[in-house]
Amino acid sequence: MTAIRGIYEVAIPVENLERAEAFYLGVLGLESGLRETERRWHFLRAGGSAGMLVLQENTGSFPSQHFAFTTSDAEIERAGVELRERGVEVTGPVTHDWMPARSIYFSDPDGHDLELCAPLDEVPPGA
């Protein structure tokens, strides 16, 4: 479908809304949008973009999800250091020749697999 230009919203289930908010707002620095107290939802934005991440509290069993945030190659190393300083276990950076891109991987408190991905113009030599 040619009308699709990107991802606008991703909703993920979380066991504890306040714990998830502490991670996504406090550790990753996302911006708070609408918080629906009665439905236990919180809409978050990243970097001033129109796209949103929605945290939905769910007390039932649910599978983990994977999603990626875009960043720049210059920020990948610094982001990994900052996450580690905040107690987050980080894997990478890993270079993906086929994209090309460099990524780091980590998990949120609910076990969702997260990625910071930096698209590259070309694969760096020796990668």
Where are these regions (language model features)?
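N-terminal beta-strand motif that seeds the catalytic metal site of vicinal oxygen chelate
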Residues: 1-18, 66-67, 120-127
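Core segments of cupin and vicinal oxygen chelate
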Residues: 5, 11-51
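Short acidic/glycine-enriched loop/turn segments that link adjacent beta-strands
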Residues: 38-41, 63, 97-102
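Short, charged/polar, Gly/Pro-enriched secondary-structure boundary elements
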Residues: 49-53, 111-114
